[in-house]
Amino acid sequence: MEQLTKNQAVATSQEAFQNQNEPQLRDENVHNDKSVHGVLNPTYQAGLRRDAVQPDIEAERKKRDEIEAGKSYCSRRFGGATCDDKSAQIYARFDKNDWRIQPAEFYRFHDAEVNTFGYF
């Protein structure tokens, strides 16, 4: 009887040694916060979506703030004139303390003659 248990112990230790060299398979019964039976936990999914959307929201907010700053700059610089969003975004990037004339390539011309013949 004792011999049988000794042989079983040796066999068990040999199996354990062999199993160390084999890749470990994921135990489907183990639960963690991220998944249960291969389905992502809704709380974890919400976190993933929020992390993916957050940079987009921040970029949109930065763009909107830049446009508002540019419109304010246009209004002050050009005596109350309003700008479209694209021009306002360009003007927002100008140095507000630099009052030298800006290169013409930064201005948007809506005049068909200027656009057709390309004076600038």
UniProtKB/Swiss-Prot annotation:
Q: Where is the composition biased (Polar residues)?
A: 1-23
Keywords from UniProt, A to Z, are: Autocatalytic cleavage, Host cytoplasm, Hydrolase, Protease, Viral capsid assembly, Viral release from host cell
- Going by the entry's taxonomy, the superkingdom of the source organism is recorded as Viruses
Q: Which residues form a coiled coil?
A: none
Identify the EC number(s). Answer: 3.4.-.-
Site annotated as Cleavage: where?
Answer: R76, R77, F78, R93, F94, R108, F109
On modification after translation, the UniProt record reads: The proteolytic cleavage of the internal scaffolding protein B releases the scaffold protein in order to continue virion assembly.
Specify where the region named Disordered lies, as residue ranges: 1-64
Q: Which InterPro entries match?
A: Phage_B, Phage_B_sf
According to its UniProt record, where is this protein mainly located? host cell
Recorded hits in Gene3D superfamilies, A to Z, give:
Scaffolding protein gpD of bacteriophage procapsid (4.10.1260.10)
GO BP term, example: proteolysis
Describe, as the record does, how this protein assembles with itself and its partners.
Answer: Component of the procapsid complex composed of 60 copies of the internally located B, 240 copies of the external scaffolding protein D, 60 copies of each of the viral structural proteins F and G proteins, and 12 copies of H.
Q: What is this protein called?
A: Internal scaffolding protein B
